[in-house]
Amino acid sequence: MSATDLDMEGFARLVAAAPQSSWQARILRLAPGDSNRFTAFCREQRIVQSDTIERQLADLAQARLPAASPAERDQFVADAVAAAGDAVAVGAWAYLPWQATVVHLLDRDAYFELITNRNRDKITQAEQERLRTKRVGVLGLSVGGESAVTVAQEHLCGEIVLADFDRLDLSNLNRLQAGVDELGLRKTTIVARRIARIDPYLTVTVFEDGVTSSNLGTFLAGLDLLIEECDGLLIKHEVRLQARALGVNVVYAGDERGFLSVEPYAHWPTLRPFHGLVETPPLPRERYPTSIAFMKALTEWLGGWSNISERSQRSLACVGETLCGYPQLASEARYAAGQIGHVARRLLLGERLHPFVGNLDLAKYLPVEDAC
């Protein structure tokens, strides 16, 4: 039992005090004989109980004993319940306060074993255990939010650190995996909740006011990898200077023509920040004379104005006049997250990747046939 896990009394105190705006799952461990009291308490507090523990045990039996007969798997389930002394005491319960729901789950190690089972052997068990020791930071939670969830879902780390100061607006729903019931919430809250619903045991740390020069060192401390996806040009530049000094690898993907940057500072300590493409510190946004001037500066982080698509160029020329912001699509955000997941997995497993900056542009590989 972890020091932060709750018993029945601790759970009751938490429910009485915890705000429903929380993003953190809490782990509850019940003792044999707690069932009636627990059920009555949840009913009184209008907390939904979700209990599929026998189905999870059967799933675990199939993963561990793929050649076993149905009777042998049934015996595996019965033995697990008997060993706990009571079905309610098998494993643990995860309390999701924002959903007023408590979910019965396998214990931490069995949960990890089962949720990563279908990764095998694209990721081996030994690799998965190694990844479990890693700490990954994600700065900026638009494309970064999808990347964070991808990293969590593949279990590429044991702790993930999320940073963004922004809140969800309706116009974000064209690309972010969120719902209308989450409008106005912090993006850190939304992403942390998504991760908690996938794996409530995964350690999540949140910088809900984002990252600035004053807390950048704290954010980077102990990271094995930084996924950089923020919009602030100054912090994009500064974070690379500090990451290089600390030997922290940086990966960044833009939702524009499959743009990808891999900056493996751990093995390439003399690599210039962002491959030397942005040599001088950018100006603060308010110092740019026009919207298009700022947008052109932003495209330096996508390989330059000439490197973005014609449609994006036309759109950016209208920002501040007929359009309010940079065009972004859900499919491109998901594609970027997939690229980041691939690179993150290889870097975190110790592969000595070469620096890379360029486009993995699907339009290039799927050209339009010329008309006859």
Question: Which residues does each PLM region occupy?
Answer:
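E1/E1-like adenylate-forming module used to activate ubiquitin-like modifiers
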Residues: 2-82, 222-331, 335, 361-372
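N-terminal, Lys/Arg-enriched amphipathic/low-complexity engagement segments
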Residues: 72-113
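A short, basic/flexible loop-to-alpha-helix module at the beginning of a structural domain
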Residues: 102-136
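Glycine-rich adenosine-cofactor-binding loop
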Residues: 127-169
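Buried hydrophobic packing segments
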Residues: 147, 151, 191, 337-345
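Glycine-rich phosphate-binding loop and adjoining beta1-alpha1-beta2 segment
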Residues: 162-199
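A structured beta-alpha segment of the ubiquitous adenosine-cofactor-binding alpha/beta core
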Residues: 188-224, 230-237
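Oxidoreductase and adenylate-handling cofactor-binding alpha/beta cores
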Residues: 267, 272, 335-354
